[in-house]
């Protein structure tokens, strides 16, 4: 199936991948060139894992996981395969985020630095917890087969909305964290004097912001949504199911030969309205 605005989508996707990759490279260059490298000994070198893993996992990989359903060359793949890829990318992002949080707490505890006093730490920990809950609920409800269809229909809009909110929160938290680190670390020369490290990390923040904006734009364009699979089951919040229009119409016609034309026309119209309304809840925005 052809995608509307295919080349525009490719341009935005390529831009997002480029900016996201540059964000990861900038984070690595920052800690390796300006912050003396990486380690796992409780020192500042261990803390340096925090920005690298957060930018790599919680920003870049999570962003790719959000838009993976929208890649048109995957539309011929089964929905189960795409769900597995989506869940796998989010699981990798979650693991990297957890390791980065552990690095911060270990560094603070070894050096007797207080934990969880800044807004960055509050919002960041909330984002990690919500992300883990989102991952667990998504795996349990949408990937495993035993969840009732009515539960999936009810949770799908919540899953989509909360995923976008969490990603936006992560972007904001990353920007707060970069600024906080520069204020604490840059003393001579001070951050206010535009030192090279300050300018470099500010640029990293802009890259993260642009990456987030591109992901938001891609994931909110309805014309780039993964098309509904033929003969797929549409979920009703009341627990019922409806087959895709092509697969259901012949059976419908055969079972209603005794009905009048007016009754058939009214039921067909009602069914089309229900399909249009329910399809929004069935297909993930992502």
UniProtKB/Swiss-Prot annotation:
The chain crosses the membrane at residues 8-32, 48-69, 79-105, 119-144, 152-179, 198-222. Present in erythrocyte membranes (at protein level). Also expressed in respiratory epithelium. L-ascorbate binds at residues 79, 83, 152. The modification Phosphothreonine is found at residue 285. It is found in: Cell membrane; Apical cell membrane. Its EC number is 7.2.1.3. Fe(3+) binds at residue 108. Keywords: Cell membrane, Electron transport, Heme, Iron, Membrane, Metal-binding, Oxidoreductase, Phosphoprotein, Translocase, Transmembrane, Transmembrane helix, Transport. It is a multi-pass membrane protein. Residues 1-7, 70-78, 145-151, 223-286 are cytoplasmic. The keyword Cytoplasm does not apply. InterPro entries: CYB561/CYBRD1-like, Cyt_b561/ferric_Rdtase_TM. One of its GO terms (cellular component) is brush border membrane. Changing residue 108 to A: Loss of transmembrane ascorbate ferrireductase activity. Residues 33-47, 106-118, 180-197 are extracellular. The modification Phosphoserine is found at residue 232. CDD domains: Cyt_b561_CYBRD1. Heme b 1 binds at residues 50, 115-118, 120, 180. It catalyses: Fe(3+)(out) + L-ascorbate(in) = monodehydro-L-ascorbate radical(in) + Fe(2+)(out) + H(+); Cu(2+)(out) + L-ascorbate(in) = Cu(+)(out) + monodehydro-L-ascorbate radical(in) + H(+); monodehydro-L-ascorbate radical(out) + L-ascorbate(in) = monodehydro-L-ascorbate radical(in) + L-ascorbate(out). Induction: By iron deficiency (at protein level). Homodimer. Plasma membrane reductase that uses cytoplasmic ascorbate as an electron donor to reduce extracellular Fe(3+) into Fe(2+). Probably functions in dietary iron absorption at the brush border of duodenal enterocytes by producing Fe(2+), the divalent form of iron that can be transported into enterocytes. It is also able to reduce extracellular monodehydro-L-ascorbate and may be involved in extracellular ascorbate regeneration by erythrocytes in blood. May also act as a ferrireductase in airway epithelial cells. May also function as a cupric transmembrane reductase. This is Plasma membrane ascorbate-dependent reductase CYBRD1. The gene is CYBRD1.
């Amino acid at each position: 199936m052809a995608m509307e605005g295919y080349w525009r989508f490719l341009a935005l996707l390529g831009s997002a991948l480029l900016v996201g990759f540059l964000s990861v490279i900038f984070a690595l260059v920052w800690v390796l060139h300006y912050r003396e490298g990486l380690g796992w000994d409780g020192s500042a070198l261990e803390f340096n894992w925090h920005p690298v893993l957060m930018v790599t996992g919680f920003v870049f990989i999570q962003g790719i996981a959000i838009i993976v359903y929208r890649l048109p060359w995957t539309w011929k793949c089964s929905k189960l395969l795409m769900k597995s890829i989506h869940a796998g990318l989010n699981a990798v992002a979650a693991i990297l985020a957890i390791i980065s949080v552990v690095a911060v707490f270990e560094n603070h505890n070894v050096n007797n630095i207080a934990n969880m006093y800044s807004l960055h730490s509050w919002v960041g920990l909330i984002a990690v917890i919500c992300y883990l809950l989102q991952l667990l609920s998504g795996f349990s409800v949408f990937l495993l087969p035993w969840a009732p269809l009515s539960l999936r229909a009810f949770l799908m809009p919540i899953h989509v909305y909360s995923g976008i909110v969490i990603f936006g929160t992560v972007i904001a938290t990353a920007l707060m964290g970069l600024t906080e680190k520069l204020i604490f670390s840059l003393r001579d020369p001070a951050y206010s004097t535009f030192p090279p490290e300050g300018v470099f990390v500010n640029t990293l923040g802009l890259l993260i912001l642009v990456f987030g904006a591109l992901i938001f734009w891609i994931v909110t364009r309805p014309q780039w949504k993964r098309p509904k699979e033929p003969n797929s089951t549409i979920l009703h919040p009341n627990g019922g199911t409806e087959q895709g229009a092509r697969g259901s119409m012949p059976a419908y016609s055969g079972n209603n030969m005794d009905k009048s034309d007016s009754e058939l026309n009214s039921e067909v119209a009602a069914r089309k309205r229900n399909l249009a309304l329910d399809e929004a809840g069935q297909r993930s925005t992502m």
